[in-house]
């Protein structure tokens, strides 16, 4: 029989509490409220200061019988919620409103009227965690004691009056796939709520999110129609927003938003707290390229947060608020016949009192497209279909109708080509779609979202500067007829080029308004905020760590090693620190190659860097291969309570590493393979296996 070691004992202990934690839906490892998140609602929110947080009261005040709540991190769930609200109103006559989960309370949902319905569109973030705006909602319904205002207990089925619809957005490359919607749905069922239709699940990992959503909603509408006796009618476009051109204002008017994110930025007096709703315009202290090979660039940037009251911890994320490239702004304005009036000032107002205006107003067409709209995003088949009524001719209309109704044809002509909306329409006809109301574009195109990067510095070493390590995206994907260029990384490359003396930066042929609205970003500034992460070093620096981070997945581990080197320099005991790093070639894209030598001098034998170069030998070698080669080392460190970290690609690398680790544990301990897999799962639940991955 295999001898029990420390890891086995830890796993046995975890088995006792892990099962309880699992069946209480993750309460024990639920993400804490983000300390960097905004304490107030977003601009134009439905529940502004002084307004009610009682959703039942709000629905009664505004005459609504359907609320669509969303928990969204990148804007997709919010977009789906808006689409459901619009479709419910136009097709079925529902009186709909969209609601941000963090803007309302939940203690009175046991009093939700039986003649109304609530939708919950819930994204899962990271390893089964709620999105930032859904943390309190998640904790309320999945906690041990759900306390409603009426005092009703769970045994009394307090949500028996609540009719609800649920759809989740997840990624099957993560272990806890669609955990948010599954756990909330289970909690609602336990509390007696009545779900209408099935709880839908969209899979971003398989690239089928949009089609999953479209396939789910039709039977859902049928079930809801039967439950609420709804009558379907022909859907005719009814604007959610009223967009008017204001000839009395010019772009030079100080009240016109030209890209400023908030009113205080517009007025030239930005102030904290800086958050996901209020970025800090941060100076870039330093920028350089770690490597440049053909169309591949990798950037290192130092962003100063001095004087902002922003703080971060090693392992956190920084969010960069991008600007759309000039070529894409021009393309969009040309396709929709707005090129000649790009500087016209427009006012945007919600026709319904509950509608949240996603763009600061007044603004201009140019500013809206450049700074506020995700015009380079993948195209929704449902949105393309709505444009048929506004096509410039019958031939174009017929093509759009076919694209909207035939998912295989749409996949061939649009999805495979990686077209954004303007590119898709350009492929149909050279005629402008001038008849498309700008209100429809605001409704159908999501708000331009910040992009998140793992911080590659230690807050102990440089508390006022944040490092970013990012590969610039400019790739030709299989099937695409053009280069697909990253919105934010090319923007950052342009900033780097400008800072380093290029008077006319044009990364991969793109140009940007580098100085920002009204030159407020002059001097090389970029809007940022910080987001908390659970990806953290052990509190005890003597505890061993094993890190697996190929490519830019090494970013947070640079911060980890930087921190441990600083602690060692102060005389603190630092445990074994092992990094598995992979790249193509040692002389091409070995990130921070010289810097590791400095840390090696500081940490001595406590730092071990094991490399995998995939294109130097006859066989491709990846980090998971090196991990297997060093099975004994990995096993020995796990026996010493090592924490295991993975950062990088979720779809392939992270899955392979997870599999190999289970095999290592089983082989080194003489256990069945399934026991090794089980032990890795319990390492995850105990926090000794952590991931910071993306797909």
Swiss-Prot record:
Keywords: Cell membrane, Endoplasmic reticulum, FAD, Flavoprotein, FMN, Lipid biosynthesis, Lipid metabolism, Membrane, Mitochondrion, Mitochondrion outer membrane, NADP, Oxidoreductase, Steroid biosynthesis, Steroid metabolism, Sterol biosynthesis, Sterol metabolism, Transmembrane, Transmembrane helix. Residues 277-538 form the FAD-binding FR-type domain. Its cofactor is FAD; FMN. Belongs to the NADPH--cytochrome P450 reductase family. In the N-terminal section; belongs to the flavodoxin family. The lineage of its organism: Eukaryota, Fungi, Dikarya, Ascomycota, Pezizomycotina. Its EC number is 1.6.2.4. One of its GO terms (biological process) is ergosterol biosynthetic process. One of its GO terms (cellular component) is endoplasmic reticulum membrane. Its main location: endoplasmic reticulum. This is NADPH--cytochrome P450 reductase. InterPro entries: CysJ-like_FAD-binding (IPR003097), FAD-bd_FR_type (IPR017927), Flavdoxin-like (IPR001094), Flavodoxin/NO_synth (IPR008254), Flavoprot_Pyr_Nucl_cyt_Rdtase (IPR001709), Flavoprotein-like_sf (IPR029039), FNR_nucleotide-bd (IPR039261), NADPH_Cyt_P450_Rdtase_alpha (IPR023173). FMN binds at residues 72-77, 123-126, 169-178, 204.
């Amino acid at each position: 029989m295999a001898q029990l070691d420390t890891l086995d004992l830890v796993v046995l202990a975890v088995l006792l509490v892990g099962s309880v934690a699992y069946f209480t839906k993750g309460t024990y490892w639920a993400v804490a409220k983000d300390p960097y998140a905004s304490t107030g609602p977003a601009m134009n929110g439905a529940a502004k200061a002084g307004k009610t947080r009682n959703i039942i009261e709000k629905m009664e005040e505004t005459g609504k019988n359907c609320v669509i709540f969303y928990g969204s991190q990148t804007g997709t769930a919010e977009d789906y919620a808006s689409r459901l609200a619009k479709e419910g109103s136009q097709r079925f006559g529902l009186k709909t409103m969209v609601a941000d989960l963090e803007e309302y309370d939940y203690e009175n949902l046991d009093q939700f009227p039986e003649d109304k319905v609530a939708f919950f569109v819930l994204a899962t973030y990271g390893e089964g965690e709620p999105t930032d705006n859904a943390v309190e909602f998640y904790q309320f319904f999945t906690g041990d004691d759900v306390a409603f205002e009426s005092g009703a207990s769970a045994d009394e089925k307090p949500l028996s009056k609540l009719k609800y619809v649920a759809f989740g957005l997840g990624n099957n490359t993560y272990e806890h796939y669609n955990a948010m919607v599954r756990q909330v749905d289970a909690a609602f069922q336990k509390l007696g709520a009545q779900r209408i239709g099935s709880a839908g699940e969209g899979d971003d990992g398989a690239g089928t999110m949009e089609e999953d959503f479209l396939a789910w909603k039709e039977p859902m509408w049928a079930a809801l129609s039967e439950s609420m006796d709804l009558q379907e009618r022909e859907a005719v476009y009814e604007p959610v927003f009223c967009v008017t051109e204001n000839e009395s204002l010019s772009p030079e008017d100080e009240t016109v938003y030209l890209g400023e994110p908030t009113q205080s930025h517009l007025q030239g007096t930005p102030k904290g707290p800086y958050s996901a709703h209020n970025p800090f315009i941060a100076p870039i202290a330093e920028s350089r390229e770690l490597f440049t090979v053909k169309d591949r660039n990798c950037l290192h940037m130092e962003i100063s947060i001095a004087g902002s009251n922003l703080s971060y911890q090693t392992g956190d994320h920084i969010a960069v608020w991008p600007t759309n490239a000039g070529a894409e702004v021009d393309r969009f304005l040309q396709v929709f016949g707005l090129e000649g009036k790009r500087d016209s000032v427009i006012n945007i107002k919600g026709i319904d009192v509950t509608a949240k205006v996603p763009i600061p107003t007044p603004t201009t067409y140019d500013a809206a497209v450049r700074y506020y709209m995700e015009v380079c995003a993948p195209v929704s088949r449902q949105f393309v279909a709505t444009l048929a009524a506004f096509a410039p001719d019958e031939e174009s209309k017929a093509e759009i109708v076919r694209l909207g109704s035939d998912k295989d044809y749409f996949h061939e002509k649009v999805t495979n080509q990686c077209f954004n909306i303007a590119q898709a329409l350009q492929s149909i006809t050279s005629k402008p779609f001038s008849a498309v109301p700008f209100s429809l574009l605001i409704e159908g195109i999501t708000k331009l979202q910040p992009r998140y990067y793992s911080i590659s510095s230690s807050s102990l070493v440089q508390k006022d500067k944040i490092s970013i390590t990012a590969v610039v995206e400019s790739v030709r994907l299989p099937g695409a007829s053009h280069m697909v260029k990253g919105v934010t990384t090319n923007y950052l490359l342009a900033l780097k080029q400008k800072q380093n003396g290029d008077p006319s930066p044009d990364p991969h042929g793109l140009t940007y308004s580098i100085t920002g609205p009204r030159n407020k970003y002059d001097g090389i500034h970029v809007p940022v905020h910080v987001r908390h992460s659970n990806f953290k070093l052990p509190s005890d620096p003597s505890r061993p760590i094993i890190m697996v981070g190929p490519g830019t997945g090494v970013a947070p581990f640079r911060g980890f090693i930087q921190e441990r080197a600083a602690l060692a320099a102060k005389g603190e005991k630092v445990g074994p620190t092992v990094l598995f790093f992979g790249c193509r070639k040692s002389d091409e894209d070995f990130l921070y190659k010289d810097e590791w030598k400095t840390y090696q001098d500081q940490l001595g034998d406590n730092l071990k860097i094991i490399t995998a170069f995939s294109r130097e030998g006859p066989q491709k070698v990846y980090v998971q291969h090196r991990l297997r080669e060093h099975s004994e080392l990995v096993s020995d460190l796990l026996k010493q309570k090592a924490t295991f970290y993975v950062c990088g690609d979720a779809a392939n690398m992270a899955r392979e590493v997870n599999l190999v680790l289970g095999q290592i544990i089983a082989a080194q301990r003489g256990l069945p393979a399934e026991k090794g897999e089980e032990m890795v799962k319990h390492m995850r639940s105990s926090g000794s296996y952590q991931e910071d991955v993306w797909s």
